[in-house]
């Protein structure tokens, strides 16, 4: 299931995924795993995490020094930057501890046409 999404939403309706980036299938993103994709429009890296069956998509960029977050340890709902140990909440993007103080962007995730999709929805 997608975090924060009504599980009955969109049933029986063909959902438009234009402007969305294909991530993969549930079988390719099991609980405890993550995957990085590049937004089809902005080319920004997005990290998608499966935490106990819920999907979260965030900017794959530490706001402390610009390093990749993907590959850092996950503690509950927090990802730890592998470079300097800053932590970010995957549910909100909030910076949880120094050396980062600015949040990371959080992106929508949806399931449609048998796959997982995300997009950089920043203006």
Predicted regions span which residues?
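Short helix-to-coil "ATP-lid" hinge immediately C-terminal to the conserved N-box Asn in the Bergerat
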Residues: 87
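Short cysteine clusters
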Residues: 62, 81-84
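Short cysteine/histidine-rich metal-coordination sites, predominantly Zn2+-binding motifs
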Residues: 76-82, 95-104
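N-terminal pre-ligand scaffold of iron-sulfur
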Residues: 9-76, 90, 103-123
């Amino acid at each position: 299931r997608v975090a924060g999404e009504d599980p009955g939403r969109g049933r029986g309706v063909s959902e438009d995924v234009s402007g969305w980036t294909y991530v993969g299938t549930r079988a390719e993103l099991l609980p405890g795993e993550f995957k990085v994709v590049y937004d089809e429009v902005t080319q920004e890296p997005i990290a998608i995490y499966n935490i106990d069956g819920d999907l979260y998509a965030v900017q794959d960029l530490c706001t402390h020094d610009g390093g990749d977050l993907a590959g850092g340890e996950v503690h509950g709902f927090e990802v730890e930057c592998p470079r300097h140990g800053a932590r970010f909440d995957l549910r909100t993007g909030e910076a949880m501890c120094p050396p980062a103080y600015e949040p990371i962007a959080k992106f929508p995730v949806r399931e449609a046409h048998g796959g997982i999709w995300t997009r950089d929805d920043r203006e």
